[in-house]
């Protein structure tokens, strides 16, 4: 048995395919009758199912060379053009399919076989060129020839290029449309052409075996053989196999998937070492699997580790030549099988190989079902965005069928000389040569950069080496990080040199600046100005006063003051007294303020007379800093520093942030984190001449960064009451009048300002929300613009990036002292390009959540890679990835990724595309509704000076740029988006578009217009359905690719237009198709 497995494993892919097909045929109940010849007068010749699939794809995207295939024959002797031409004519006489074209009538194609055909032959003499130039010229000419499209209706579907390389050396390069030629045909072509060429040169008989049938006989037989009973059996199996499969596989693309898929592609080649190839073949033999099964499993494991997908469909071609009558017949017989792979938690590579082996055996036994029938029966959403059922393919070729064109240049050099197309997002093509596996990744260049695919080749070799050595590897643990990636992660997370400046407390920063710049203005508020000496002394007096009131270490003290110098004095006084700062925003609802005070345990509150009434019902002692008695007591108090020893682990402040349950949770931040904050502030390079606006709400931790970056530089902090800090013209006027040079704003707030109107604003720091390309383009001209990222749990900022006008602002790299980790759901590092959840580590982490140990344990985890005892990681809930340049890119929130109708959707991607609309300043997308009624809803704010966009206009804008499943059904155009007191978007306050009516929400009237009525009648006749409504989708009411061509033919005839088949995929609803008709008719009017 072991010897048999070894012999099977040693078969070439072509031998193996033939063996498996014959084995399956031998297992059938009895011998099938031979395929009969078709009577000459039996009416129109039908297309085979495979031909019809490619004919339809050509109708969908006419004029594309993506389904051009080629073969070549090296002629190592002098040869005459006449002999080549005679051999080609004899070849087409032997194989009718090479004389076939596909005219159509009423959207129904048929085969038309010409009586005779001598293929077009172009001859080019390259003999005068040097060797290297000759090879390059030959490759270029062949590549250009392969990219020329064919006309399927008129043909011919074969053309030839004769390249004379030397007097005794020539290359015959043939390009076919795939409808008449497949990979299996390459060997037959070489055999037949070699014999026919020799016969033409010598005047002898070629000695080729007679063909019992022609391709048209096969096509007719296939249509008859696959009767309803057999089709039902096959469909039953395949429907069950793909039931519930995700419609797309989400790979780590470098660019968003375009609304209409392109076919521009490229190839990146690789070769597995001989010893690894041998080990993989041995693994196949030990596992009772073929090399094809083994390498398909390796590919599936690679896709899982690279993308995180657990349920995927991988397409693979099969020769589909089980009948002996087809052995010598050139033509397109190949079918495509959809191999579904499902990965369970804890599964090993060996487990997956056993699953794949079973899947392949079952699929080969049922390979007769035409792929297009499966697509139609699956009722998958038909779109021009991606291939149905699968977008990733795997091919394993026999090395003996490799193109003789490959001998002209070294393997690596071929990629640069062979511009190509890509049928799918990604295809792995392996060639099984005697000593090694070589191959290439064919990829869509609209989605991937070459460097990403090169890294993928490295990952393949890493993973293959691991499983060849031990198939017991858990899939989730398989190594796929390249050496460069590992080196980068070590560099960005490397420990930093110790610096005493980074051990200071926040009030220590103030004290240092008071020594260096005692008479420089520290605070400029509407009520008064304070120098650094005055601010330090005022904070000292208040700190002594607090100590006299009995304030203890780590006792929370509330501070609720609005835009006055006292607000800054109180902040530093609480810290100098060794207490815990509890900043409160007076604009918060009374219920929220009461909850924070009660939950924090604060018994002392520093506020002002105008705000005292807001806290009257709370059980706290109130100190009114603007009260005359308080002022007098403070004036008589000591101005020296209390000088209390404060350990780094003592709490500095507690800030309450929104909780997922709606109840705020208190984040406890120790003084240790201020050192990390100092490192952050240093990157903004402020000077004593800088004037920093205090914009953030005091209950938002960015307000502390505003203080630190100002006072560490000896600069001036500009204060205004919160009521005047209104984004828009009021804020712009304030920045001009107060000569503000530096701001820290949320992108929402920054988007309300115009860069050209604020020339004095020299430093802009964006934080708190995802920054946009539009903001970078507007503000990066001549300014220092930064994107800062960091949750409250990591002391304000953990990463910083300097922005550039030509890219979406990234999160950048970690601030010194922090570590960043992009992990999967098993808490393992993910490869570059793949999205994962961001975890933060380092000295800047908060202690946890106040009185919530369970929540703390859930969000703060032990750091398995930490070098210090007790090292922890904070789970941010943010979805990021490492970009190709080694910077972190923000993708969204884990709770902002949704799944609708099987599609995983990142709402932020839709928002970004909406904001690209010239009439939209900012946008938000949510999911509204419940259960099966869940729908995407888009909200847009009109851009200043632009016409108010309509729901229909926004919908069409997105349709032109995004897949259909990412286009919201509902739209609301608003004057402004609701925000919370800290300037962030308040999603909960957005209105429900389901309650709106008219064009704003995108609702359509139910009545049909005359064009819709006429199209409705055509749908009823062709599909045999009840009258459809204007919003009905063609593919959801029973339409498929077969009926789509007939529908479009009928519509074009009825309205005198020339719509392409693709229009039904762009606008699959009845009303959408009617709009396309009306637009086409309008264009044709004089």
UniProtKB/Swiss-Prot annotation:
Pathway connected to this protein: Secondary metabolite biosynthesis; bialaphos biosynthesis
Protein's GO biological process: amino acid activation for nonribosomal peptide biosynthetic process; antibiotic biosynthetic process; lipid biosynthetic process; secondary metabolite biosynthetic process
Domain observations: Modular protein that contains a condensation domain, an adenylation domain which activates the alanine residue into an aminoacyl-AMP ester and a peptidyl carrier protein domain which bears a phosphopantetheinyl arm to attach the activated amino acid.
PROSITE patterns: AMP_BINDING, CARRIER, PHOSPHOPANTETHEINE
Residues with PTM O-(pantetheine 4'-phosphoryl)serine: 1041
Pfam families on file: AMP-binding, AMP-binding_C, Condensation, PP-binding
Region spans: Disordered: 22-43, 983-1007
NCBIfam families: AA-adenyl-dom
Top EC class of this enzyme: ligase
Cofactor(s), by name: pantetheine 4'-phosphate
Catalytic activity line of the entry: holo-[peptidyl-carrier protein] + L-alanine + ATP = L-alanyl-[peptidyl-carrier protein] + AMP + diphosphate
Entry GO CC: cytosol
Purpose: Involved in the biosynthesis of phosphinothricin tripeptide (PTT), also known as bialaphos (BA), a natural-product antibiotic and potent herbicide. Adenylates L-alanine and loads it onto a peptidyl carrier domain via a thioester linkage to the phosphopanthetheine moiety. Shows weaker activity with aminobutyric acid and L-serine.
Paired cysteines (S-S): none
Gene3D superfamilies referenced in this protein's UniProt entry, alphabetically: 3.30.300.30, 3.40.50.980, ACP-like, Chloramphenicol acetyltransferase-like domain, Luciferase, Domain 3, Nonribosomal peptide synthetase, condensation domain
Protein name: Phosphinothricin tripeptide synthetase PhsC
EC code(s) of this entry: 6.2.1.67
């Amino acid at each position: 048995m072991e010897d048999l497995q070894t012999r099977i494993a040693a078969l070439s892919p072509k031998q193996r395919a033939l063996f498996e097909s014959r084995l399956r045929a031998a297992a059938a109940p009895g011998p099938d009758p031979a395929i009969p010849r078709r009577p000459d007068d039996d009416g129109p010749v039908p297309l085979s199912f495979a031909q019809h699939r490619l004919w339809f794809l050509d109708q969908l995207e006419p004029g594309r060379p993506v389904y051009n295939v080629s073969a070549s024959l090296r002629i190592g002797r002098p040869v005459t053009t006449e002999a080549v031409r005679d051999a080609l004519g004899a070849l087409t006489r032997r194989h009718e399919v090479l004389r076939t074209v596909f005219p159509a009538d009423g959207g129904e194609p048929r085969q038309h076989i010409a009586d005779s055909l001598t293929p077009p032959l172009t001859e080019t003499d390259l003999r005068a060129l040097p060797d290297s130039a000759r090879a390059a010229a030959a490759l270029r000419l062949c590549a250009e020839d392969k990219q020329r499209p064919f006309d399927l209706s008129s043909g011919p579907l074969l053309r030839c290029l004769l390249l004379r390389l030397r007097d005794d050396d020539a290359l015959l390069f043939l390009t076919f449309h795939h409808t008449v030629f497949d990979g299996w045909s390459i060997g037959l072509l070489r055999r037949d052409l070699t014999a026919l060429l020799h016969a033409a040169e010598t005047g002898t008989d070629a000695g080729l075996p007679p063909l019992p049938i022609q391709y048209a006989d096969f096509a007719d037989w296939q249509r008859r053989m696959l009767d309803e009973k057999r089709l039902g059996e096959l469909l039953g199996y395949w429907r069950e196999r793909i039931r519930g499969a995700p419609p797309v596989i989400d790979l780590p693309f470098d660019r968003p998937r375009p609304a209409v898929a392109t076919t521009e592609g490229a190839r990146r080649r690789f070769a597995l070492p001989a010893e690894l190839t041998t080990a993989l073949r041995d693994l196949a033999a030990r596992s009772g699997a073929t090399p094809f099964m083994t390498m398909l499993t390796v590919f599936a494991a690679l896709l899982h580790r690279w993308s995180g997908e657990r349920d995927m469909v991988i397409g693979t071609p099969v020769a589909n030549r089980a009948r002996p009558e087809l052995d010598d017949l050139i033509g397109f017989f190949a079918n495509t099988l959809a191999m579904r792979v499902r990965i369970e938690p804890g599964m090993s590579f060996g487990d997956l190989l056993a699953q794949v082996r079973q899947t392949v055996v079952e699929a080969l036994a049922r390979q007769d079902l035409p792929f297009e029938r499966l697509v139609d029966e699956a009722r998958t959403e038909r779109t021009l965005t991606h291939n149905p059922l699968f977008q990733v393919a795997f091919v394993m070729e026999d090395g003996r069928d490799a193109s003789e064109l490959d001998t002209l240049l070294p393997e690596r050099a071929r990629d640069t000389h062979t511009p190509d197309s890509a049928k799918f997002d990604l295809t792995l093509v392996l060639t099984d040569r005697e000593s090694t596996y070589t191959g290439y990744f064919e990829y869509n260049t609209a989605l991937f950069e070459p460097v990403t695919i090169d890294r993928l080749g490295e990952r393949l070799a890493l993973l293959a080496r691991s499983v060849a050595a031990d198939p017991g590897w858990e899939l989730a643990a398989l190594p796929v990080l390249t050496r460069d990636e590992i080196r980068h992660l070590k560099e960005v997370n490397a420990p930093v040199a110790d610096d005493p400046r980074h051990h200071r407390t926040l009030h220590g920063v103030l004290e240092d600046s008071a020594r260096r710049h005692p008479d420089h203005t520290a605070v400029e508020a509407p009520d008064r100005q304070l120098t650094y000496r005055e601010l330090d002394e005022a904070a000292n007096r208040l700190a002594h006063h607090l100590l006299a009131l009995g304030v203890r270490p780590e006792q929370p003290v509330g501070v609720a003051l609005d835009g006055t110098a006292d607000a800054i004095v109180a902040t530093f006084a609480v810290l100098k007294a060794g207490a815990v700062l509890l900043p409160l925003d007076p604009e918060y609802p009374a219920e929220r303020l009461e909850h924070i005070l009660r939950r924090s345990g604060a018994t002392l509150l520093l506020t002002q007379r105008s705000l005292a009434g807001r806290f009257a019902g709370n059980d706290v002692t109130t100190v009114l800093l603007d009260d005359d008695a308080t002022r007098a007591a403070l004036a008589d108090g000591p101005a020296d520093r209390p000088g209390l020893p404060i350990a780094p682990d003592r709490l500095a402040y507690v800030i309450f942030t929104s909780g997922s349950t709606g109840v705020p949770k208190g984040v406890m931040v120790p003084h240790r984190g201020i050192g990390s904050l100092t490192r952050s502030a240093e990157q903004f390079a402020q000077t004593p001449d800088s004037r920093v606006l205090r914009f953030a709400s005091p209950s938002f931790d960015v307000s502390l960064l505003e203080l630190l970056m100002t006072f560490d530089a000896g600069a001036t902090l500009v204060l205004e009451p919160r009521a005047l800090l209104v984004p828009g013209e009021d804020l712009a006027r304030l920045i001009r009048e107060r000569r503000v040079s530096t701001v820290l704003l949320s992108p929402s707030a920054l988007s309300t300002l115009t860069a050209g109107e604020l020339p004095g604003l020299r430093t802009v720091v964006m934080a708190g929300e995802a920054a946009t390309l539009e903001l970078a383009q507007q503000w990066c001209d001549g300014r220092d613009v930064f994107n800062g990222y960091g949750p409250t749990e990591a002391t304000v900022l953990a990463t910083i990036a300097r922005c550039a006008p030509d890219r979406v602002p990234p999160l950048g790299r970690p601030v010194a002292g922090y570590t960043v980790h992009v992990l999967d759901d098993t808490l393992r590092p993910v490869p570059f390009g793949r999205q994962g959840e961001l975890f933060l580590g380092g000295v800047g982490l908060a202690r946890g959540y106040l009185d919530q140990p369970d929540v703390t344990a859930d969000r703060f985890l032990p750091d398995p890679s930490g070098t210090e005892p007790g090292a922890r990681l904070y789970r941010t809930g943010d979805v990021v990835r490492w970009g190709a340049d080694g910077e972190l890119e923000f993708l969204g929130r884990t709770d902002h990724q949704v799944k609708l109708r099987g599609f995983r959707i990142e709402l932020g991607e839709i928002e970004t595309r909406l904001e690209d609309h010239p009439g939209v300043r900012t946008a938000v997308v949510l999911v509204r509704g419940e259960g099966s009624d869940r729908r995407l809803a888009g909200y847009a704010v009109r851009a200043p000076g632009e016409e108010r966009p309509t729901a229909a206009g926004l919908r069409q804008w997105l349709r032109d740029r995004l897949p259909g499943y990412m286009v919201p059904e509902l739209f609301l155009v608003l004057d402004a988006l609701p925000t919370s007191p800290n300037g962030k978007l308040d999603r909960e306050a957005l209105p429900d578009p389901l309650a709106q009516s008219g064009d704003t929400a995108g609702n359509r009237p139910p009545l049909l217009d005359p064009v819709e009525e006429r199209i409705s009648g055509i749908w009823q006749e062709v599909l045999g359905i009840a009258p459809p409504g204007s919003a009905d989708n063609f593919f959801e009411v029973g339409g498929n690719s077969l009926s789509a061509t007939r529908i479009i033919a009928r519509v074009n005839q009825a309205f005198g237009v020339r719509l392409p088949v693709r229009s039904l995929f762009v606008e699959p609803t009845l009303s959408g198709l009617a709009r396309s008709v009306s637009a086409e008719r309008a264009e044709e009017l004089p």
